[in-house]
């Protein structure tokens, strides 16, 4: 369709399947172009008008092709075929209402202050597999993006500032699935699940001016009936007549996958019902996995206003703890890491922490399946397990090196320290209560060592499943050893020591007397190797 010097105005365009309409005419600026049908509208001229898309593809070939774009139903797609082909306001002139639609960057970078998406029906992707597209979200106050991000995209949330802008919080409660990086500078990023919306009753009384003609107010009856049943079955959250609440148990799980998350002077948190996979590289940043705070958009599902071309959001935050998962490796400098209640962290990538303290709260579990080094200590109120490195597509394991310069500090009776599966651990252990310390596992459970590392494993592990080097100061704790060797290099004290098929080897400095004090000792097929000065014996 071609035209010069005139505008088109009509009910809209319905394009059939596998059909393409090349649009080289102008649509009337005082009307809204409606596009339906599964076919493609290829827009070749800047329109100066708005468009609403219910189905099919719309290709944008000019800068600012439309003033505003509206997508609904989830069946429409906008494809960028030129840089800056969207608008230049904070929403880039595109609005995703109920069930949204897809924005395909198609190899073009795109910047938003906020993405006007009302639910997880919105997807931003890049179908160009050869050219990475940068999706920049630069909000400077709290904002929740409910949609999905996938394809060949690099996501950035960078604030141009000398100082960290803690209010510049980007909250993702949809999903991310990319093999590329995520980058955050001078700002905050949260990944979490999404509180499921519930139907609610009207909050006002029924309108009936002639009372004697009014029937039963069934809304009130239903509310009272629902409330009584929910009290009976301990599901009171269903009777609060709120679309969402922090104490409700039904949250959708958000899944977030990326290559590496780069943090510079930034805050990153994983809150309830989030499953995050990827590596983290942090500098002067704070990482919280299992954050006790969560966020709710009180207008979720109803964010799009003003006839489809505006966006509103009201965010609440409160305590709301749920299970979180993180899988990857962490490299951090001059940062801090906190692992919160109900967090499960699997460090399957190498972890190097320089001047970066880490704490593991009660109820949290950390499994280090790769080497871990820290120049600080590790505070443990939950559970830390250190292991060897499982080889992909194989049952063999490479020994894992774990080192804490300031040692491992166990607090409370629920603290649990475990080293097994070809782990070599160095660092003193301190426990202030009846903690549990487990070294090694039965020989029948010990995995096969990778053939390329047999000699190295023998040097590290002395033929045992696990090797530990350091002193243990834990007068109330229990230490269990099974197929393990303990190189005891300084004064140690333990409430209970149980050894099976193991060795305790005193390796203190020459000329220094090393003492192991144990209140209760159980030995099964084990050895204690003590050095002696035979010339003076």
State each model region's role.
Residues 522-537:
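Strand-loop-strand
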